[in-house]
Amino acid sequence: MKVTGIFLLSALALLSLSGNTGADSLGREAKCYNELNGCTKIYDPVCGTDGNTYPNECVLCFENRKRQTSILIQKSGPC
C-alpha cells in the first residue's frame, strides 16, 4: 500500500512537471507565404511579441520582412 502511494505521488509529480515547458510563452512563428500581391484584407488579428496587434499573420510577416525583425505571435486575437 505504501509503495503504491509513493508510485502514484511520483507519477503525479512527473505529469505536473511535464505539462508546461515554458516554450509556449515565447510565442509561435507566423505562417508566412510568398504573397506577391500583398496580404488579404481579412481581419483575423494576432498579438505580436512586441505588444502590437496585427490585422492578420500575413501583415505580421510583411512587417518582419520590412523591418528585418522576427516578431512572433504571442496569441490569436488583439493584444
Swiss-Prot record:
Localization recorded for this chain is: Secreted
**Disulfide linkage:** 32-61, 39-58, 47-79
All copies of domain Kazal-like, residue ranges: 26-79
What Gene Ontology molecular function terms does this protein carry? Answer: endopeptidase inhibitor activity; serine-type endopeptidase inhibitor activity
Which SUPFAM superfamilies would you find in this protein's record?
Kazal-type serine protease inhibitors (SSF100895)
Q: Known consequence of changing residue 12 to F?
A: In PCTT; benign
Q: Which residues form the signal peptide?
A: 1-23
Keyword check for Repressor: no
Record-annotated site: Necessary for sperm binding: 43-44
So which domain of life are we looking at?
Eukaryota
Where do transmembrane segments lie in this chain? none
Broad class of where this protein is predominantly found: secreted
Mind telling me which residues the site (Reactive bond for trypsin) is annotated on? 41-42
Asked whether the UniProt record includes Transmembrane among its keywords, one would answer: no
InterPro entries, per the entry: Kazal_dom, Kazal_dom_sf, Prot_inh_Kazal-m
User: Tell me, what does this protein do in biology?
Assistant: Serine protease inhibitor which exhibits anti-trypsin activity. In the pancreas, protects against trypsin-catalyzed premature activation of zymogens. In the male reproductive tract, binds to sperm heads where it modulates sperm capacitance by inhibiting calcium uptake and nitrogen oxide (NO) production.
* Protein name, per record: Serine protease inhibitor Kazal-type 1
Species this chain originates from:
Homo sapiens
Q: What is the lineage of its organism?
A: Eukaryota, Metazoa, Chordata, Craniata, Vertebrata
Name of the gene this protein is made from: SPINK1
